[in-house]
Amino acid sequence: MAANCERTFIAIKPDGVQRGLVGEIIKRFEQKGFRLVAMKFVHASEDLLKQHYIDLKDRPFYPGLVKYMNSGPVVAMVWEGLNVVKTGRVMLGETNPADSKPGTIRGDFCIQVGRNIIHGSDSVESAQKEISLWFKPAELIDYRSCAHDWVYE
């Protein structure tokens, strides 16, 4: 990984998968210039989801969130690029789709907060934790994109 790059964890939730939005979401990250370094299609276990959402365990919506995330397959991904955590969050839109601007993923494709189709790390530290939870180090593929010099100075 280049010195000025960081990585983020992005997961397309079961509703995003069921609605056929996987390709559109990947396309947006690729077109922005970010590099995909890992991806898997998984039915996340309840234990994995409880670890992933441990910070929310005392919130009233926690049981429903774990059930929803366990209701179908998820596309788990790691993206790399300059300021990818912050920029990725902007691309996703607000957690509540009603507050998301048109042009964002949630602004374009979501209506309710309980079905907001995508998760993105909220900090570099969270990204590192989430990546290590969902992926083994050997699953992160390091390569140089032929588009790199056309995206970065």
Swiss-Prot record:
Q: What class of enzyme is it?
A: transferase
Q: Where is this protein chiefly located? A: cytoplasm
EC number(s) on file: 2.7.4.6
Q: Which reaction does it catalyse?
A: a 2'-deoxyribonucleoside 5'-diphosphate + ATP = a 2'-deoxyribonucleoside 5'-triphosphate + ADP; a ribonucleoside 5'-diphosphate + ATP = a ribonucleoside 5'-triphosphate + ADP
Cofactor(s) essential for the protein: Mg(2+)
Q: Which domain of life is it from?
A: Eukaryota
Q: Which PROSITE patterns match?
A: NDPK (PS00469), NDPK_LIKE (PS51374)
Localization per Swiss-Prot or TrEMBL? Cytoplasm; Cell membrane
Catalytic residues, per the record, are H119
Write one Gene Ontology MF term: metal ion binding
Q: What is this protein called?
A: Nucleoside diphosphate kinase
Name its species.
Gallus gallus (Chicken)
